[in-house]
Amino acid sequence: MTKSIIREIGPLALNFQDDKVLIFFGDNAPSELREYSIIHDVEVFNQNDFSAGAKLVIGKYVYEIEAVGGEAANNMSKLGHLVVYFTEVPDEILPGAVYAAPHIFPIVSNGEEVLITL
C-alpha cells in the first residue's frame, strides 16, 4: 500500500478540472509549481502498487488505475510527485502519469488520505 495525506491545496491546483488532471508534490515542490499542486506527505510507499489494475482512493473517491507511466513510481518515491489523469489512456503514456477511471474529477480537501493499493 502507498499512503499519503493531503496537507495543502495550491490556489491554482484545481484549475485543471476541465482537463481532469491533479498534480501532487511533496513538501519540496518547486515554488513555481507549488501553486498548481496538491502538497501531500507520503507516509507509506510501495513501488509495486504502481500498476494497471491497482486501486486509487482519494478521500471518498475510488478509482481503478488503467495505466502507469514508466517514471511514476520513481517520481513519487523521490519527490512525492504524481500526475493523475482522469481521462482515457492515450496512445503514448506520459512517463510520470497515472491514468484512472472512472473519469470523474475528485473534490479534494486538506487532511484527506490518498491510497494506492493492489
Residue ranges with predicted function:
Residues 33-45, 91-100:
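Short, structured beta-strand/loop micro-motifs enriched in basic residues and often containing a Trp
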Residues 1-37, 112-113, 118:
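N-terminal disorder-to-order initiation segments that are Gly/Lys/Arg-biased
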Residues 59-60, 118:
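Conserved "cap/hinge" positions at secondary-structure junctions
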Residues 72-83:
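Short, solvent-exposed secondary-structure boundary/capping segments
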Residues 24-25, 88-118:
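Helix-rich interaction surfaces within compact, conserved domain-sized segments
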Residues 46, 52, 72, 102-104:
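Short, conserved secondary-structure segments in the cores of folded domains
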Residues 48-51, 56-57, 108:
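Short, well-ordered loop/turn sites that connect or cap secondary structure elements
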Residues 61-62, 68-74:
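Short, conserved beta-turn/loop elements at beta-strand boundaries and strand-helix junctions
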